[in-house]
Structures are given as structure tokens and as C-alpha cells.
């Protein structure tokens, strides 16, 4: 704001100190300076706005808004006031007010290019595409520059993209945009590459692929110069759309002759060759094969072409990988066609061996060969690995010393072999003792490799880090398959040690986060996740690793913090993408604008966003709303309406990165598309249950007095259902969602450890909390019915309520029984974690909170009836008036409820005392059968202290249990 050029206006000189104060964050001084200036110059509008900015930044939003509107009502046209108001409205998150500001300015100064331009950008921020189109044309009429004209054209395209009616898009908006561009083409007014890109975009969206191809191949296509091969790539895309496989083949062949290392064109070349074979295409007897030149239409041609590229590469000083990998890809495709024997390109095993000899010292060698290992017969895998090891330069092994590499090149080669060994499943077929031997060897190689990285910076990874990761993966195998928790403690120790040598290794941190969470130890996770320094979209793609466990492990403060991190990103998404769109208009990057819109929609419809939003509101209610009054206030402050569902169920997008962990597992053990599909299904079911629970809770305060007249018809006013009907409908939907979820859980789906994280749904059902919560909401419905009908003649309803109260109390006792047990069990020096106990306890606390809100509602209904009966007794002095048994039943229920809560608090205190009494340093974490090397004691102690320390946070649950118990005595 303070970056202001040379000015002649004396007002600018007067305003400069205020700008400086605001830029330096000294908002109070800015307000004082503005007040001084306004005493002398009352009509200096900009000073008022700058004062409003200071007020806004000091939390005095209402004063700031009032002051800003005073100035806006005057419809200022000076640049300083307009810019200051724009900044203020942005900080207020009111971009729609900026449009009104510049609409007024444009009316007063109709020929101002600057104001028209600002108006266009203001419309862009709020997505007013129709008005953007009009503003763009108005700007072009004032200043006939091409960019302004094409702003209007692009706004038409945006109208077509946002139109719900696809037919309207293709019959009105896009044809109009096409005619506008064609007018400029005919008048020979196309000047910039961006304008050609826009024309191409319109034709492509209209499905006019041939016309788009003609544009790219014609004179206009010559303007496409900013990106390498931009013209060729667009031609290729159109050839594919038009199924012009001869041209597709010839163009990809020609591009490969220029650059034989471009992998994307190998794939296109192979696709086109086999398409032509399928169609039995033959070249014409005379003339060119196609518009792009010679065409290869047989397998023989493809084989010869690849062999020629390899020969050419061997004669070049530059080592290229493309031709060698293309040969393996061709073998795969020929084999799938059943004609590999006819065209002998060589044995895949030998080809991969030769490839390893050429590129084995490159980190990319493993990822290159990973794609083709399925060409190897299972019986040859061990032989293949031994063959690779035979060419790795290692020292001579002795009885007490491994064969080790002498340099980084040798280390990379050996590391590639080890990765391939795991990928081929050779480690998985070993027994436990063999796996432990592998772990020992890998860790010795890891420590030896550290010698090569002594000069590495803290931000760099050690060359041997993958050895440590692979050792951890093998230990995880032992843990998951044999159930030996000692192995996972050892894995934690190795990861902690690895992190001291490679503080920036994200894989170490991610694995630590995953394992600590599974063990139920959340305290170290927060710092580990923070150290990952997740940026922007990563809050959506990997945030689930943190938010899934925070609340479920009783870490309420951390859960609130992690939700805030994620929500801050999602809420800023709308503002950020608007700025990206504006920049794209300014610089003519029109093809990026639909991408930005799609990106924004993808984030707005994010599954993780919906989950975090729902869990955060539930968490806030549980932490803040202790009694029904504050529950009503909390729900009001959150603007929660039970009848409104804000989750875009039909458009939910799963943006989680489920491949974030490095994995060297064979295909049958790795994360599959089926796993991802099932995980999304499970996450959606759980979100539906949580969303309905939240809406049911938000419906409770609306049921309190005044109630509908006795025996009244349940009617709808203005199409809005009565409050209890909303609750009953939501309860019905919840029961359906629960049944669907139970059927899913019965499948007992097991995800890979490094794959999707299971939801809390299974524990929710098995703990009995689900049944308890549903039962409590049914109780609300019955009590509401009693309230509307009165005590007289409702014996059946009263008996139903009495039975519900008794069964609800029994259900709660059953839930509490699942919370009993120690969080850590120590036996023979070994420790075993019981995170299920903690998760059950957290669900129990949540259920208790819901039950207490329901009980509070019941009390609010029953109390007036009891008082009324007591008044009648006193007034008539009659002893014949009998108190209905429902009051006694409710009182017994409340007494029992308080006993359950008291027992729960005592249990939590007992858990804490048990944890503190543990002498953690005496735990034997270095099982001699697993310990591969003499690890530093500090790493072992770090894990010893870090994990149990997490459970001490359980104290946060205890006051919550006690505080949410309102006085519900009647």
C-alpha cells in the first residue's frame, strides 16, 4: 500500500504518514493520524477510509463498516479513496461492495479506462460473468484494444462453463463467442498467441475438432510459440479426437526423430500403430502417406523403428533412456496382442539387465524398471536379482563384514537391487528370522551409507535413507503379520534415528505420524506434521493423516488446531483463486481460467473439507455447549439449521493422496483402485452419519417451549416442515445411514497399512455408542409427543418414555464397560498399546454429552408439569392427586446417569495414575532378536518417553465429563 510513486497532489503527501503506519502494523497511530488530518480537512474522504482500515484491523469492524459506507455513499471518484475502499472491502470479505463502488465511479467518469478495468476485475472476483462480458465490451468501445475485446469473449466462455444447461452453453454462449472471434479473424486483427489459444478453446468446446485443427495448422497457428511443441501437441490432441491415426502416427514418429527421449510420443506412436493394425490400414499407392508424412502401420515397422532409435542412441554421446524403455513397452504390447514370438526383440530379463548396467547408478532406474517387472516369470525373479547383484561393485565380504559399496555410484546400484527385491516379493516370502536378518543387513548398509553424506546440508536427504525406510517396511510386515508389537517399537526407533540424520525426510515423518496414530499416541504427531510444512493443496491431500486421529484419541486442543489449519486453507481458496483468475485475464492466460475454476470447485466439494467442517462444529459443541442454553447459543453462532444440508453429496471429490507413502510392495499387496473406491465409500458413509448427528443436535434447542397447541395438526407454514418433523426425518435418515454402514463394516475390508486409513465407523458401532445416540434421539421424539399431548390420557407414551430411560441407562453402562482396560500393558519388559480403549472412551464422552443435552430437554418438558401438579396439591390441599411414575423414573435415571459419569471420571483418573506409575525407562524396546545394530540410547529413550506421554493428555477428557453434566434434577 505504501509503495506510491511520485505525486504532485498535496493530499497524497498528507496521507503518506497514515499509509506508513498501516504498512508497519501500527494501526492505532494510523487512526490517530487520520483523526488529526480530518480535523483540518473534513472532506478528505481517503483519510476516513484509511481510518476505517485501522479500525477494521483493531477489531472494531462495525465502526469501520459505518465509516466506509459514509464515504461510499458519496460515490467518490478519486483514485486514493477507491483503492483504499477496495482494500478495506477485501479485508472485510465483502468483494461485492467493490463492484458497487466502481459502478458508481464509471457512471460519473464514463470514459475512464482505469475505472472500467477495475470494474471488470471486481466482477471477476465475484464471478459475475454476464456483467464481465458487458464491462469488457464497454471497455473495448472506449479504448479499442484487443485484450479488452477478448476479455469479453472469455467471459462468454465462462458463462458457458457455469451454465447448468449444457444445451444453452453449446447453442448460445459458445457460438456467440465463436462469431466474435471470427469477426476479428476476418478483419485480420488477431495479434497475440493468447487470442489464438482462445479461438482454439472455443472450437474444441464446440466439438469442431477439424476447424480447430485447421486453425492450428494454418497461419494463426504460427503464433503459438511460447511453449515448446505447443502447436504439435494441439495437433496431436485433435488427431486423436478425429481418430486420424495415420496423421497421429506420422507426427509422433517425426517428433521422436527429433527427440528420441520423449516418452509421451512413444506411447502415442504405439497407440497409433496398433490402431492402424486393427483397422487394417494400408498406405496409398502414390503420394504422401498422410498430411504429416510417412506412416508406420505394422508391427515390423514399429520393431525396426525402435531398433533404429536404440542404434542411434548408442552412437550418441548423450545417454537417453527412452528407446530402451520403449523396447520393453513394445514387448508388453506385442505380448498382449499374442505376437511376441513372431517379432523377437529379445528376452525382457536380459533387456532389463542391460538397462540396469547402463542406468543402475541413477535414482530413476528403479522407477523405470518398476513398470515392466510383470514381464518377468515368477520363477526367474531370484535369478534376475542375483544377476543384478553380480555387476554391483561391492567389496569382498568376510564372516563379520558385509560386501559394501566403495562410492555413491555403487550404493545407488545396490539400493536399486534391494528395491527391486522387495517389489518382486522376495522379502514377503521369507519367514520371520529371515526378515530380521534382512533388517539387520539393511540398517548396517544404512549406517555405512551415512559416510557418503557427511557434507550434506540439513535440507538434503542422505544417500542411504531408502535402506532405513526399507528396513522399517520389513518390520511393519512382521508387526502386521505376526502381531508382534516389539517390531513396531523398533521401527519407531529406526525412524527417529533416521530423522536425526535427515531432518527434512518427509517419508520418515509421514511414517512416524502413521505409526504413532495407530498406536494411539498423538502428542508427537502434531510437531511431526507441523515440521512437514504442508503448503496450500497439501492441507487437503495429506491433512487426513492428522485430522482422522486428533479427536478420536482425545486430543481436543490438537484436534481443534488441526481443523483450523485445514479450514483456513479452504476458506482462503475462494479469495485466492479469484486473484489467480484476475491475473490470468491481465496476462492473457485464458486457457488457465477454466482450470482455476475447476480447481476452486474441486476444493469446495472436497470430501476432506466437508469432514473437517462437520467434525470442527461437533468438537466446538462438545467443548463449549455444556447445557441447553449455551447449546442454543453455540448453534446460533455457527448458523446451523437442521433442515439444511450443506454437504454436496453428489459432487464430493476425494482429493486425498493415498499414494503419499513410498511403497515397494508387489502389486497384489499395494494400494489398488478398488481399495481407493471402497475407502471413499466408507468415508462418505461416516460423513453422512456425522453430518446427520450434528444436524440432530442442532435441532434440540428448537424443540423447547413454546410448543404447538395441544392435539394440533402438524402443519407446514410456507412449505417449511414443523421442527419435530425435521428431527424425525433426520432420525430416520440416520437409521438408514447406520444400517448401510453396518453392512459395509461386516465386509471386514482390510486396507494396506500404507494405504487408506479406516474410519472411526467400526469402533462407533462396536462400542455401542451408535445405538445409544440413536436411542436418545428417539427419546426426544417421544418426550416432544408427550409435551404436545399433555399428561392426561398419555399413559402409553409415558410408559414408553420410562422404558426408554431405563434402557438408555443400561446402554450407557454397556458403552462404559468397553472403556475399561489399561491404555498400556507391560509384560515381561514389553509394552503393548490398547488404543481401542481410548477411542471407546472418547466416543463415550461424546455420547454422554448428547445424552445430557437430551436429558436437559426432557427436564425442560417435565419440570413444568411437575410444578403444576404440586401447585394443584397445595391449592386444593388434596392428597388424592397422584404423581405420575414418569417423574420418579426420570429422577432414578438422572441418579444413575450421575453415577455413570462419576465412575467414568474415576476411571480416567485411574488410567492417568497407572501411566504415571510406569517406569518407562525399564521397558525393553530393544528385543535382541530384532535389534539390528547398536542404536543410540537417546533414540530408544525418545520413543519410550514420547509414546506413553501422549496418553497423559487424557486429562482433557476428565473435566469434559464433569462439566457437561448440567443440573437436570426435577
From Swiss-Prot:
TM spans (from-to): none
Asked if the Swiss-Prot or TrEMBL record annotates the protein with the keyword Magnesium, the reply is no
Repeats (TPR): which ranges? 11-44, 45-78, 79-112, 114-146
A GO molecular-function descriptor: acetyltransferase activator activity
Subcellular localization? Cytoplasm
UniProt keywords, alphabetically: Cytoplasm, Repeat, TPR repeat
State a single Pfam family of this protein. Answer: NatB_MDM20
Q: One GO CC term of this entry?
A: cytoplasm
Where is it mainly found? Answer: cytoplasm
InterPro entries from the entry?
A: NAA25_NatB_aux_su, TPR-like_helical_dom_sf
What biological-process terms (Gene Ontology) are attached? cytoskeleton organization
What's this protein's function?
Answer: Non-catalytic subunit of the NatB complex which catalyzes acetylation of the N-terminal methionine residues of peptides beginning with Met-Asp, Met-Glu, Met-Asn and Met-Gln. May play a role in normal cell-cycle progression.
What family is it from? Belongs to the MDM20/NAA25 family.
Q: How does it assemble?
A: Component of the N-terminal acetyltransferase B (NatB) complex which is composed of NAA20 and NAA25.
Protein name as it appears in the record:
N-alpha-acetyltransferase 25, NatB auxiliary subunit
Q: Which organism is it from?
A: Rattus norvegicus (Rat)
**What's the gene?**
Naa25
Amino acid at each position: 500500500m505504501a509503495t506510491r510513486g511520485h505525486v504532485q497532489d498535496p493530499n497524497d503527501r498528507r496521507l503518506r504518514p497514515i499509509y506508513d503506519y498501516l504498512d508497519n502494523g501500527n494501526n492505532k497511530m494510523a487512526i490517530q493520524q487520520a483523526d488529526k488530518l480530518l480535523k483540518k480537512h473534513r472532506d478528505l474522504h481517503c483519510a476516513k477510509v484509511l481510518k476505517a482500515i485501522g479500525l477494521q484491523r483493531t477489531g472494531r469492524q462495525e465502526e469501520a463498516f459505518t465509516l466506509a459506507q459514509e464515504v461510499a455513499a458519496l460515490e467518490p471518484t478519486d483514485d486514493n479513496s477507491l483503492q483504499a475502499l477496495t482494500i478495506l472491502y477485501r479485508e472485510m470479505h465483502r468483494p461485492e461492495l467493490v463492484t458497487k463502488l466502481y459502478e458508481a465511479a464509471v457512471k460519473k467518469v464514463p470514459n475512464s479506462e482505469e475505472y472500467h478495468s477495475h470494474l471488470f476485475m471486481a466482477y471477476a472476483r465475484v464471478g459475475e460473468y454476464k456483467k464481465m462480458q458487458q464491462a469488457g465490451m464497454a471497455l473495448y468501445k472506449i479504448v479499442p484494444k484487443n485484450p479488452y475485446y477478448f476479455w469479453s469473449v472469455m467471459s462468454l466462455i465462462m458463462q458457458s462453463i457455469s451454465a447448468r444447461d449444457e444445451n444453452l452453453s453449446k447453442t448460445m454462449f459458445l457460438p456467440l463467442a465463436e462469431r466474435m472471434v471470427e469477426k476479428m479473424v476476418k478483419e485480420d486483427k488477431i495479434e497475440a498467441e493468447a487470442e489464438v489459444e482462445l479461438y482454439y478453446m472455443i472450437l474444441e468446446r464446440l466439438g469442431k475438432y477439424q476447424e480447430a485443427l485447421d486453425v492450428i495448422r494454418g497461419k494463426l497457428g504460427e503464433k503459438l510459440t511460447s511453449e515448446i511443441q505447443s502447436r504439435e501437441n494441439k495437433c496431436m490432441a485433435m488427431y486423436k479426437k478425429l481418430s486420424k491415426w495415420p496423421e497421429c502416427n506420422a507426427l509422433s514418429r517425426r517428433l521422436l526423430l527429433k527427440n528420441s527421449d520423449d516418452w509421451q510420443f512413444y506411447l502415442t506412436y504405439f497407440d497409433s500403430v496398433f490402431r492402424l493394425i486393427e483397422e487394417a490400414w494400408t498406405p496409398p499407392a502414390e503420394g504422401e502417406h498422410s498430411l504429416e508424412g510417412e506412416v508406420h502401420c505394422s508391427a515390423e515397422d514399429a520393431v525396426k523403428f525402435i531398433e533404429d532409435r536404440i542404434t542411434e542412441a548408442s552412437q550418441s554421446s548423450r545417454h537417453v533412456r527412452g528407446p530402451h524403455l520403449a523396447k520393453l513397452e513394445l514387448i508388453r504390447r506385442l505380448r498382449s496382442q499374442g505376437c511376441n514370438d513372431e517379432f523377437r526383440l529379445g528376452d525382457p530379463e536380459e533387456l532389463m539387465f542391460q538397462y540396469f548396467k547402463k542406468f543402475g547408478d541413477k535414482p530413476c532406474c528403479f522407477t523405470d524398471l518398476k513398470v515392466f517387472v510383470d514381464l518377468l516369470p515368477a520363477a526367474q525373479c531370484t535369478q534376475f536379482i542375483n544377476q543384478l547383484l553380480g555387476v554391483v561393485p561391492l567389496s569382498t565380504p568376510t564372516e563379520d563384514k558385509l560386501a559394501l559399496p566403495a562410492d555413491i555410484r555403487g550404493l545407488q546400484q545396490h539400493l536399486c537391487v534391494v528395491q527391486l527385491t522387495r517389489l518382486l516379493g522376495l522379502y514377503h516370502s521369507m519367514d520371520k528370522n529371515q526378515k530380521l536378518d534382512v533388517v539387520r543387513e539393511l540398517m548396517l548398509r544404512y549406517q555405512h551409507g551415512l559416510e557418503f553424506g557427511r557434507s550434506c546440508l540439513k535440507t538434503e536427504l542422505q544417500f542411504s535413507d531408502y535402506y532405513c525406510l526399507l528396513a522399517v517396511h520389513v518390520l511393519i510386515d512382521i508387526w502386521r503379520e505376526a502381531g508382534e508389537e516389539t517390531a513396531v517399537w523398533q521401527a519407531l526407533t529406526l525412524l527417529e534415528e533416521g530423522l536425526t540424520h535427515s531432518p527434512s525426510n518427509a517419508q520418515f515423518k509421514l511414517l512416524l505420524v502413521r505409526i504413532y496414530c495407530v498406536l494411539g499416541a498423538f502428542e508427537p504427531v502434531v510437531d511431526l506434521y507441523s515440521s512437514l510444512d504442508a503448503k496450500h493443496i497439501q492441507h487437503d491431500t495429506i491433512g487426513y493423516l492428522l485430522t482422522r486421529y486428533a479427536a478420536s484419541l482425545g486430543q481436543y486442543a490438537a484436534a481443534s488446531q488441526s481443523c483450523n489449519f485445514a479450514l483456513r486453507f479452504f476458506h482462503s481458496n475462494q479469495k485466492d483463486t479469484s486473484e489467480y483468475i484476475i491475473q490470468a485475464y491481465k496476462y492473457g492466460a485464458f486457457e488457465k481460467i477454466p482450470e482455476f475454476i475447476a480447481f476452486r470447485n474441486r476444493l469446495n466439494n472436497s470430501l476432506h473439507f466437508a469432514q473437517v467442517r462437520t467434525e470442527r462444529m461437533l468438537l466446538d459443541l462438545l467443548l463449549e455447549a455444556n447445557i441447553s442454553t449455551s447449546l442454543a447459543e453455540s448453534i446460533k453462532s455457527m448458523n446451523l439449521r437442521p433442515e439444511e444440508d450443506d454437504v454436496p453429496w453428489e459432487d464430493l471429490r476425494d482429493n486425498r493422496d493415498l499414494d503419499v507413502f513410498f511403497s515397494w510392495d508387489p502389486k497384489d499387496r499395494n494400494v489398488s483402485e478398488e481399495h481407493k473406491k471402497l475407502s471413499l465409500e466408507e468415508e462418505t458413509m461416516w460423513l453422512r452419519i456425522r453430518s446427520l448427528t450434528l444436524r440432530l443436535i442442532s435441532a434440540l434447542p428448537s424443540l423447547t417451549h413454546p410448543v404447538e397447541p395441544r392435539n394440533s395438526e402438524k402443519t407446514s407454514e410456507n412449505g417449511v416442515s414443523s421442527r419435530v418433523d425435521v428431527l424425525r426425518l433426520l432420525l430416520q435418515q440416520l437409521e438408514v445411514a447406520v444400517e448401510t454402514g453396518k453392512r459395509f463394516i461386516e465386509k471386514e475390508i482390510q486396507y494396506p497399512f500404507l494405504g487408506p486409513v479406516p474410519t472411526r465407523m467400526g469402533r462407533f458401532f462396536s462400542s455401542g455408542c451408535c445405538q445409544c445416540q440413536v436411542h436418545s434421539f428417539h427419546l426426544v421424539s417421544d418426550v416432544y409427543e408427550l409435551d404436545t399431548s399433555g399428561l392426561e390420557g398419555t399413559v402409553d407414551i409415558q410408559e414408553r418414555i420410562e422404558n426408554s430411560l431405563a434402557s438408555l441407562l443400561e446402554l450407557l453402562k454397556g458403552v462404559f464397560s468397553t472403556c475399561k482396560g489399561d491404555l498400556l500393558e507391560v509384560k515381561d519388559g514389553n509394552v503393548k498399546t490398547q488404543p481401542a480403549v481410548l477411542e471407546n472412551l472418547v466416543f463415550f464422552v461424546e455420547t454422554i454429552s448428547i445424552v445430557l443435552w437430551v436429558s436437559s430437554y426432557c427436564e425442560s418438558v417435565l419440570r413444568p408439569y411437575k410444578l403444576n401438579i404440586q401447585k394443584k396439591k397445595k391449592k386444593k390441599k388434596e392428597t388424592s392427586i397422584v404423581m405420575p411414575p414418569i417423574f420418579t423414573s426420570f429422577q432414578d435415571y438422572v441418579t444413575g446417569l450421575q453415577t455413570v459419569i462419576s465412575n467414568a471420571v474415576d476411571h480416567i483418573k485411574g488410567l492417568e495414575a497407572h501411566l504415571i506409575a510406569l517406569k518407562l525407562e525399564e521397558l525393553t524396546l530393544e528385543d535382541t532378536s530384532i535389534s539390528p545394530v547398536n542404536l543410540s540410547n537417546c533414540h530408544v529413550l525418545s520413543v519410550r518417553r514420547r509414546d506413553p506421554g501422549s496418553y497423559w493428555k487424557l486429562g482433557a477428557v476428565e473435566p469434559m465429563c464433569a462439566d457437561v453434566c448440567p443440573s437436570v434434577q426435577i
